Amino acid sequence: MLNPKVAYMVWMTCLGLTLPSQAQSNDYRPSYHFTPDQYWMNEPNGLIKIGSTWHLFFQHNPTANVWGNICWGHATSTDLMHWAHKPTAIADENGVEAFTGTAYYDPNNTSGLGDSANPPYLAWFTGYTTSSQTQDQRLAFSVDNGATWTKFQGNPIISTSQEAPHDITGGLESRDPKVFFHRQSGNWIMVLAHGGQDKLSFWTSADTINWTWQSDLKSTSINGLSSDITGWEVPDMFELPVEGTEETTWVVMMTPAEGSPAGGNGVLAITGSFDGKSFTADPVDASTMWLDNGRDFDGALSWVNVPASDGRRIIAAVMNSYGSNPPTTTWKGMLSFPRTLSLKKVGTQQHFVQQPITELDTISTSLQILANQTITPGQTLLSSIRGTALDVRVAFYPDAGSVLSLAVRKGASEQTVIKYTQSDATLSVDRTESGDISYDPAAGGVHTAKLEEDGTGLVSIRVLVDTCSVEVFGGQGEAVISDLIFPSDSSDGLALEVTGGNAVLQSVDVRSVSLE
């Protein structure tokens, strides 16, 4: 038997790939975030729970580490953390790639693609014809609980000629179907994104196959939305309870290509009303509509078919907005850690709030706990802790004018610094010394989000650290910053410090995270 390390080097050489540097021994693969077993991944697709199994589909190139040959990759999990890689679910074939889409259960077999004893699961996706670069909408179905998928023989279900009256490019920019059953109207609803036209279109169907255009949601019809927010993609749509009330509201979530707080792609969400044909947006607040202020939260979608007994709206996105530039050689693209999304009033404003799913607690072990301790300028806490996969929680009362800093993945010349600046109520992530930032002009820098103290003056920060990422949740989850980082293996330290005044640490809990 060939030595595994030698076999790996031979395999890499045969593929023409560069070996990871000695400073990074495992190609930056994360410890507890999902990555494809190899090659390219971008945004998640068709997120659905079937029985006790969570299904993750994702945009995947199964043959190379760059975008292209796009199909639906597939993985399953019973806890959203331990993932089993599965064969390709929806392949690219006959010159048609399988772009982004969504999945849904058809319990009454309205599609006719199953039967009453075994209703089908349906997946809608954009078919991208490489020769013409046109995009149409297609359907696949599963009658074995999502294990395998068959393309509908009558594809496309919305052709480019049908799209053309509602798409000024004639079908070059109609993609990413979000489909769900609208109980109130008794119809199936499809939401399509129209890229550079900065609009969504809404379609209805009685049978999931034959579709009729109903309306457009344009940027000009959303009061308060900046004209700089362009290139709409990857829509999601769902009802969300407003915590503390008996009300629900409709939410549209999407990913503009430009205009996000950190530059480039970002995910925003807007509330409004939906009558089964058209969505009327509430006026937006630029300070609360972005779900993430970091650079690396792109193409978010939510899991559907989650039992009411669970009740959570769980979302995830791809953490990569640099194309094929990141310095990984055997894989590209990783899934953000799944997070819950809810809507509640924080202070005087209504916010979307997000938190890592509670399942994370089952794979974490406490390394150090501090309580009711004052940290003063010149002190450094947590410096004895080492780790590259951590869940760090800090709750503190900052003095006026103080700055609390938590350095993670800290080494001799590398660190990623999470700061809270009391004077302007700002949470920030500083990647300027985070490791390798040479791969892309946008790879370094400082990303910020507003985070007010609560009514008692308390500030809460939670940081998920993994091999090549940080995800920072401030307050109740109203301020979130997600970023990729690429430090050396040896940069595994922590440091908690304060300048400009003291901070009273109500609690500090540092946990190691492991899937093993």
Swiss-Prot record:
<dbReference type="InterPro" id="IPR023296">
    <property type="entry name" value="Glyco_hydro_beta-prop_sf"/>
</dbReference>
<dbReference type="InterPro" id="IPR013320">
    <property type="entry name" value="ConA-like_dom_sf"/>
</dbReference>
<comment type="similarity">
    <text>Belongs to the glycosyl hydrolase 32 family.</text>
</comment>
<dbReference type="Pfam" id="PF08244">
    <property type="entry name" value="Glyco_hydro_32C"/>
</dbReference>
<feature type="binding site">
    <location>
        <position position="320"/>
    </location>
    <ligand>
        <name>substrate</name>
    </ligand>
</feature>
<keyword id="KW-0624">Polysaccharide degradation</keyword>
<keyword id="KW-0964">Secreted</keyword>
<keyword id="KW-0119">Carbohydrate metabolism</keyword>
<feature type="signal peptide">
    <location>
        <begin position="1"/>
        <end position="23"/>
    </location>
</feature>
<feature type="glycosylation site" description="N-linked (GlcNAc...) asparagine">
    <location>
        <position position="108"/>
    </location>
</feature>
<keyword id="KW-0378">Hydrolase</keyword>
<protein>
    <recommendedName>
        <fullName>Extracellular endo-inulinase inu2</fullName>
        <ecNumber>3.2.1.7</ecNumber>
    </recommendedName>
</protein>
<feature type="glycosylation site" description="N-linked (GlcNAc...) asparagine">
    <location>
        <position position="210"/>
    </location>
</feature>
<dbReference type="InterPro" id="IPR001362">
    <property type="entry name" value="Glyco_hydro_32"/>
</dbReference>
<keyword id="KW-0732">Signal</keyword>
<dbReference type="InterPro" id="IPR013148">
    <property type="entry name" value="Glyco_hydro_32_N"/>
</dbReference>
<dbReference type="GO" id="GO:0000272">
    <property type="term" value="P:polysaccharide catabolic process"/>
</dbReference>
<feature type="binding site">
    <location>
        <position position="176"/>
    </location>
    <ligand>
        <name>substrate</name>
    </ligand>
</feature>
<feature type="glycosylation site" description="N-linked (GlcNAc...) asparagine">
    <location>
        <position position="372"/>
    </location>
</feature>
<feature type="glycosylation site" description="N-linked (GlcNAc...) asparagine">
    <location>
        <position position="109"/>
    </location>
</feature>
<dbReference type="InterPro" id="IPR013189">
    <property type="entry name" value="Glyco_hydro_32_C"/>
</dbReference>
<feature type="active site">
    <location>
        <position position="43"/>
    </location>
</feature>
<keyword id="KW-0325">Glycoprotein</keyword>
<feature type="binding site">
    <location>
        <begin position="41"/>
        <end position="43"/>
    </location>
    <ligand>
        <name>substrate</name>
    </ligand>
</feature>
<dbReference type="Pfam" id="PF00251">
    <property type="entry name" value="Glyco_hydro_32N"/>
</dbReference>
<keyword id="KW-0326">Glycosidase</keyword>
<dbReference type="GO" id="GO:0004575">
    <property type="term" value="F:sucrose alpha-glucosidase activity"/>
</dbReference>
<dbReference type="GO" id="GO:0051670">
    <property type="term" value="F:inulinase activity"/>
</dbReference>
<feature type="binding site">
    <location>
        <position position="61"/>
    </location>
    <ligand>
        <name>substrate</name>
    </ligand>
</feature>
<dbReference type="GO" id="GO:0005987">
    <property type="term" value="P:sucrose catabolic process"/>
</dbReference>
<comment type="function">
    <text>Endo-inulinase involved in utilization of the plant storage polymer inulin, consisting of fructooligosaccharides with a degree of polymerization (DP) value from 2 to 60.</text>
</comment>
<dbReference type="GO" id="GO:0005737">
    <property type="term" value="C:cytoplasm"/>
</dbReference>
<dbReference type="GO" id="GO:0005576">
    <property type="term" value="C:extracellular region"/>
</dbReference>
